[in-house]
Swiss-Prot record:
Gene encoding the protein: HMGR2
Designated name of the protein: 3-hydroxy-3-methylglutaryl coenzyme A reductase 2-B
Bilayer-spanning residue ranges: 36-56, 80-100, 545-565
Lipid bilayer topology: Multi-pass membrane protein
The species this protein was found in: Panax ginseng
Cellular localization per UniProt: Endoplasmic reticulum membrane
Organism lineage string: Eukaryota, Viridiplantae, Streptophyta, Embryophyta, Tracheophyta
PANTHER family in alphabetical order: 3-HYDROXY-3-METHYLGLUTARYL-COENZYME A REDUCTASE
């Protein structure tokens, strides 16, 4: 295994002239010419720079206030300017030259590198890039072999082989040391990426340590073939591998006169096939149409006052149209795309819940709206100093949980999608009839859901399609809860011959930038739908189109499942496509 190496000295035999060269080169330093120790000299010039800068800015402000010409300079100001220039020259000379030299390096002869121990140590101690291959055939210090001219390759081969064998033993030993440290608890597992500088190596070491601690094998969990650098600090902490979920394609879905191939990541048999059948029925009937009703993400902080009267005063202030422009100005400065749309308040005793709604461009927008809300809370603190902010989220938002406020007011994208399915398509493709579908929809999705006390669940299986598309497209799977709020309506039209079907989904929460959308697999699925990344024309159309595609896919899934139920095909199809025959055979044996 490849690990981050310490400066390798064991690969060089003792007594070689490299050591003497290293000692000679390090005997004299530029800092030896300074009258004070290096840290004191640096501290002195830093203090001088900031002190003189503060003095000059203070004098400049006084001159502007007193209408004194800026070119009139006193003796103290002249001395301050001289000290400022001197400190700038020193700091640039001390820090700037070294930085420039690190960017523009000469190309030394390859044989000079072989005779320079410092060059070998510098290359060997350099951190390998994140997600580099975990099995490395050559250690970093052997990369210099590539720079050796062809005529010297034979003379260099023996040195390469000797160093390779020595380094391999060191790598294994260091890997074992790190694993033992993680198992013993002396090295925190979460710090491996920062300590090693190699995300793939960190995942491999963490994985091995976990297996030793638990005594359980992770052989079936893949490790290689994933870009762990892409999730660092963004998608997942302390990774030990990745889970594989198959992706199927349903479609083409003909929506708003455009065809889409819908990626669905699922482990449920029949789901993709059923949705695909619904897409076929919609396509054969002329396609579906969707309309975006609302587009606004919400966040609702909770604050507390000493009395209900004070809480009501803030409520009236926030809901007063005269104050909206000021609040929007404060809110909008947190982002180029976040624009405040409205504030709705609710009181519970002396506690006030403020539900902010804002547009978020092509992002799902939770972080964006949270930053804007924080700006408004800081602003309100000036006029309401007795306001005690209890939490940036008070569950009046409401995120990742079923809530009537989302069902009624909406959250994210509110979409309605409809289609008229022709009578012959219902019979030939869906294997049922219009009257049976309409009656079953009333009994199951409307009356049955009401009997169950459903909240936003007036549908057959909207969450099945939403979850599958969300996983494939890099959305937050937990937001499937409110995103699956859906009411499915069916009605006989054209003298009872054709079927009008619609789905109304008030809180589809999607984005095409940020989060899991930047991962390679999920990005490819978004690209398939034509909604990858942010729109170049204006903020928002990609995420709104993705929400419409989700609603159209749900429409297809609802149509197919309800037809299977009406025709009595559900059990038969699941026994054929959704059984684990391998597990059954094992149990029978």
């Amino acid at each position: 295994m490849d690990v981050r190496r310490r400066p390798v000295t064991k690969t060089l035999t003792a007594g070689e002239p490299l050591k003497s060269q290293n000692q000679h080169s390090s005997s004299l330093k530029a800092s030896d010419a300074l009258p004070l120790p290096l840290y004191l000299t640096n501290g002195l010039f830093f203090t001088m720079f900031f002190s003189v800068m503060y003095f000059l800015l203070h004098r400049w402000r006084e001159k502007i206030r007193n209408s004194v010409p800026l070119h009139v300079v006193t003796l103290s100001e002249l001395a301050a300017l001289v000290l400022l220039v001197a400190s700038v020259i020193y700091l640039l000379g001390f820090f700037g030259i070294g930085f420039v030299q690190s960017l523009i390096r000469p190309s030394p002869d390859s044989w000079d590198i072989l005779e320079d121990d410092n060059a070998i140590l510098e290359e060997d101690s350099r951190c390998e890039p994140c997600a580099a291959a975990i099995d490395c055939s050559l250690p970093p210090n052997l990369k210099i072999a590539r720079m050796v001219p062809q005529k010297h390759k034979s003379a260099f081969a023996d040195v390469v082989e000797e160093q390779k064998q020595s380094a391999s033993a060191t790598i294994i030993d260091e890997d074992e040391e790190i694993i033992n440290a993680v198992v013993a608890g002396t090295t925190p597992s979460y710090s491996l990426e920062s300590k090693l500088g190699d995300c793939l190596k960190a995942a491999a070491i963490r994985r091995e340590a976990l297996q030793r601690i638990t005594g359980k094998s992770l052989d079936g969990l893949p490790l290689d073939g994933f870009d762990y650098e892409s999730i660092l600090g963004q998608c997942c902490e302390m990774p030990v591998g990745y889970v594989q979920v198959p992706v199927g394609i349903a479609g083409p879905l003909l929506l708003n006169e455009t065809e889409y191939s819908v990626p669905m990541a699922t482990t449920e048999g029949c789901l993709v096939a059923s949705t695909n059948r619904g897409c076929k029925a919609i396509y054969a009937s002329g396609g579906a149409t969707s309309v975006l009703l609302k587009d606004g993400m919400t966040r609702a902080p909770v604050v507390r006052f000493g009395s209900a009267k004070r809480a009501a005063e803030l409520k009236f202030f926030l809901e007063d149209p005269m104050n909206f422009e000021t609040l929007a100005l404060v809110f909008n400065k947190s982002s180029r795309f976040g624009r405040l749309q409205g504030i709705k308040c609710a009181i519970a005793g002396k506690n006030l819940y403020m539900r902010f709604t804002c547009s978020t461009g092509d992002a799902m927008g939770m972080n964006m709206v949270s930053k804007g809300v924080q700006n408004v809370l800081d602003f309100l603190q000036n006029d309401f100093p007795d306001m005690d902010v209890m939490g940036i989220s008070g569950n009046y938002c409401s995120d990742k949980k079923p809530a009537a406020v989302n069902w009624i007011e909406g959250r994210g994208k509110s979409v309605v999608c409809e289609a008229i399915i022709k009578e012959e398509v219902v019979k030939k493709v869906l294997k049922t009839n219009v009257a049976a579908l309409v009656e079953l929809n009333m009994l199951k999705n409307l009356a049955g859901s009401a009997v169950a006390g459903a909240l936003g669940g007036f549908n057959a299986h909207a969450s099945n399609i939403v979850s599958a598309v969300y996983v494939a497209a890099g959305q937050d799977p937990a937001q499937n809860i409110e995103s699956s709020h859906c009411i499915t309506m069916m009605e006989a039209v054209n003298d009872g011959k054709d079927l009008h079907i619609s789905v109304t989904m008030p809180s589809i929460e999607v984005g095409t930038v940020g989060g899991g959308t930047q991962l390679a697999s999920q990005s490819a699925c978004l690209n398939l739908l034509g909604v990858k990344g942010a729109s170049k024309e204006s903020p928002g159309p990609n995420s709104r189109l993705l929400a419409s595609i989700v609603a159209g896919s749900v429409l297809a899934g609802e149509l197919s499942l309800m037809s299977a139920l009406a025709a009595g095909q559900l059990v038969k199809s699941h026994m054929k496509f959704n059984r684990s025959s391998k597990d059954v055979s094992k149990l029978s044996s």
